[in-house]
Amino acid sequence: MARRRALSTAALAATAALVVSAAPAHAANPSYVALGDSYSSGTGTRSYISDGTSCLRSVYAYPSLIASAKGYDLNIRACSGAKIADVSNTQLSALSSSTAYVSISIGGNDAGFASVLTTCAQPAWLSNCNGAIDKAQAYVNQT
């Protein structure tokens, strides 16, 4: 009887060990990297993440909102004022084989988007809005 109890206890312990080891590990949240310029960083929200940069990254930027809603681990590399070369030189290194999602918005600073806005916000007799738009459009078409 004692031997049978010992065998039953050993079998139960072995089964419990198998069940514990067969349990799936808690899956990590998907990794999401946000690249780009002020459109992605959240410039203009007036509520910025203190990360030691002048990138004006915000908890209200669309990447932050998506990551929060979906449960993604966010690495926001987007930076206010970034140009295409900045993404290539300083942001792409955030991507890895574990990156599940990527978003990017870039090109407005290269094309002179801010100049178009400031030019076209002036009275027509004082500025050349069409010329500013044409210049930006030419840049986009040639890129």
Where are these regions (language model features)?
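Residues in and immediately flanking transmembrane alpha helices
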Residues: 18, 50, 72, 118-120
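Serine-esterase "nucleophile elbow" of acetyl-processing enzymes
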Residues: 27-78
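Extracytoplasmic/secreted cell-surface and envelope-processing proteins
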Residues: 42-44, 84-87, 111-115
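Conserved phosphate-coordination/catalytic loops
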Residues: 57, 86, 138-142
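Catalytic-core regions of hydrolytic enzymes
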Residues: 79-99
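Alpha-helical cap/lid subdomain in secreted, periplasmic
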Residues: 92-143
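Secretory targeting and sorting signals
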Residues: 1-27
